[in-house]
């Protein structure tokens, strides 16, 4: 079958056999797989697995599913506490990073990773469940609620997903984004533009030190800054004195787990089903699997208009 892997440090399509690492796994015929910014970062790391941790497809009986790609043991204290995303045994192991992922014709996954799709959610858009769950987890972690002023910094997928989650919670949401098409996507979702004054919650979804500094500047005294963005080069916290004097709480957010006894991927699927405008706002390009090299080139060109680029085997 076809699969997207790196060849001499570049993305390419190769022929591989379907992995049989998990004898109890179920085979998903992939319909859609999103390109994540982390995929672009990992291009030069020499990872020899099939890429893709944002994907959806169909089972052998035709059932449409999304996939929660995190692998966990289910038995450690973190898993038992509903924090399977920080499992002590698996440590963030994920399909598409440590195991063959969804940028392929088929992928074999553990049955516990399947996400049922609510009515109204198309399988072609269900690849957005995974990144939306990241935003769901970040907003859950800082208790975003109705009546709050929320600023989202960063107009990529996680930033726009955070806009959608915060709006669904009833917050008044503004977006600060670098590119015009990102601003327009935020407006389609209902976000305002960043304004003067202080915010109760700031979501830092840009992944830069300057964005963290802006977040600390913008949050009210006693407020909270959530950081769902990945800082690949590490982060020296800016504005440390202001951070202390305002008693700002920094809350990092990594992937997703459970909230009030429910998987956050299921919460994300439910939200996506009733927010069809999200897919329309963020999915800017769709490519066939054979065109993966061009799709990755487009995905890397944020200034050129790409937000979420999707591969469709």
What is each residue range found by the language model?
Residues 226, 248, 275-283, 293-313:
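C-terminal capping/lid region of NAD(P)-dependent oxidoreductase domains
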Residues 176-179, 205, 254:
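N-terminal Rossmann-fold cofactor-binding loop
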Residues 235-284, 293:
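C-terminal substrate-binding/catalytic core of Rossmann-like NAD(P)-dependent dehydrogenases/reductases
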Residues 42, 73-153:
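NAD(P)H dinucleotide-binding glycine-rich loop of Rossmann-like/cofactor-binding domains
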Residues 142, 184-249:
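Glycine-rich cofactor phosphate-binding loops and adjacent beta1-alpha1 units
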Residues 121-195:
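Mid-domain Rossmann-like dinucleotide-binding core that forms the NAD(H)/NADP(H) cofactor-binding site
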Residues 19-33, 41-80, 113, 118-120:
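Glycine-rich beta-strand-centered segment in the early N-terminal region that forms part
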Residues 6, 18, 46-54, 94-99, ...:
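Short Gly/Pro-enriched turn/cap motifs at secondary-structure boundaries
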């Amino acid at each position: 079958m076809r699969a997207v892997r790196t060849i001499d440090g570049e993305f390419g399509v190769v022929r591989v056999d379907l992995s049989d690492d998990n004898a109890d796994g179920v085979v998903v015929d992939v319909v859609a797989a999103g390109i994540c910014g982390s995929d672009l970062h990992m291009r030069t790391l020499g990872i020899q697995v099939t890429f893709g941790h944002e994907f959806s497809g169909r089972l052998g009986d035709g059932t449409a599913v999304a996939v929660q790609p995190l692998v966990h043991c289910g038995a450690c204290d973190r898993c038992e506490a509903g924090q399977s995303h920080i499992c002590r045994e698996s440590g963030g192991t994920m399909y598409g990073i440590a195991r063959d992922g969804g940028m392929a014709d088929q992928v074999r996954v553990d049955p516990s990773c399947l996400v049922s799709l609510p009515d109204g959610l198309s399988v072609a858009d269900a690849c957005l469940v995974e990144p939306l769950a990241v935003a769901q987890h970040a907003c859950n972690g800082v208790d975003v609620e109705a009546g709050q002023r929320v600023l989202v910094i960063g107009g990529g997928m996680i930033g726009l997903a955070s806009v959608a989650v915060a709006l669904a919670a009833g917050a008044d949401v503004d977006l600060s984004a670098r590119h015009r098409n990102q601003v327009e996507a935020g407006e389609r979702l209902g976000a305002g533009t960043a304004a003067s004054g202080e915010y109760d919650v700031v979501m830092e979804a840009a992944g830069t030190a300057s964005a963290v500094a802006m977040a600390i500047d913008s949050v009210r005294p006693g407020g909270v800054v959530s950081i769902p963005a990945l800082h690949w080069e590490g982060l020296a916290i800016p504005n440390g004195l202001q951070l202390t004097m305002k008693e700002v709480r920094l809350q990092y957010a990594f992937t997703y787990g459970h909230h009030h006894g429910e998987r956050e991927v299921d919460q994300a699927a439910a939200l996506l089903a009733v927010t069809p405008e999200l897919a329309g706002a963020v999915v800017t390009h769709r490519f066939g699997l054979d065109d993966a090299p061009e799709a990755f080139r487009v995905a890397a060109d944020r200034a050129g208009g790409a937000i979420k680029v999707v591969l469709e085997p």
